[in-house]
């Protein structure tokens, strides 16, 4: 989860590496190399396939979060912002918050996915060591719009639907996001969410994209060998 150059990168017999938590430069952009290509984490389980996707207007919760606050400190500002929100304006929202003792130690997997499917928004703070999380993709697949404070600059976030704001103004971010979801303007976002699930997070589509990258790599090698 550290966004470093992967093991084997300097081996002469390595043709191509598809990498989760792809290497980043100092500006949190994708580190462009001829040997590596970033791919999304996707969900931690495939239970989403059997769960009904409800319309936004029929969902029980405004926002949810079930997860840990790791000792690495990556979610400290998130926890402070969330505590402040609940204390000062918690009665203005419908939510479910549960803090757990570690990764995947909260709700049962299906129960967790069903919870996401019953929420309009999903709070998606950074992981223990990376800005990226399974939660972002699980939420997207369940139709719960992710709320983030920052994301790395990878191709698979470019067309993703999400709301962005600093955790210390979480109440403002949530209010604006929920109000937006009540307007007709949100249709394009929800349509984009569905297209994202059917394209970027679709197994067959991702495999096709990876094949294209492999073919492209073959072509580059063949072209360079001619000179």
Residues of each region from the PLM?
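Intrinsic disorder/low-complexity signature
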Residues: 42, 169, 185, 194-199
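C-terminal "capping" alpha-helix adjacent to the active site of nucleotide-linked donor transferases
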Residues: 165-187, 211-214
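Nucleotide-sugar donor-binding catalytic core of glycosyltransferases
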Residues: 1-163, 181, 198-225
């Amino acid at each position: 989860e550290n966004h470093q150059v992967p093991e084997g990168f300097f081996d002469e017999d390595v043709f191509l590496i598809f990498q989760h938590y792809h290497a980043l430069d100092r500006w949190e952009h994708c580190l462009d190399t001829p040997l590596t290509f970033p791919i999304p984490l996707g969900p931690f389980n495939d239970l989403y396939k059997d769960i009904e996707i409800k319309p936004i207007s029929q969902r029980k919760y405004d926002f949810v979060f079930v997860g840990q606050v790791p000792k690495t400190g990556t979610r400290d500002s998130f926890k402070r912002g969330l505590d402040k929100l609940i204390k000062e304006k918690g009665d203005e929202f419908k939510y479910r918050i549960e803090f757990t003792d570690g990764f995947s130690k909260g709700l049962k997997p299906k129960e967790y996915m069903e919870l996401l499917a019953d929420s309009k928004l999903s709070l998606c703070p950074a992981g223990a060591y990376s800005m990226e999380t399974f939660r972002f993709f699980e939420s997207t697949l369940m139709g719960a719009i992710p709320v983030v404070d920052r994301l790395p600059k990878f191709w698979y976030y470019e067309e993703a639907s999400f709301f962005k704001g600093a955790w210390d103004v979480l109440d403002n971010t949530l209010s604006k996001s929920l109000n937006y979801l009540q307007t007709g303007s949100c249709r394009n976002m929800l349509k984009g969410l569905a297209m994202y699930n059917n394209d970027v997070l679709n197994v067959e589509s991702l495999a096709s994209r990876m094949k294209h990258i492999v073919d492209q790599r073959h072509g580059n090698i063949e072209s360079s060998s001619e000179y």
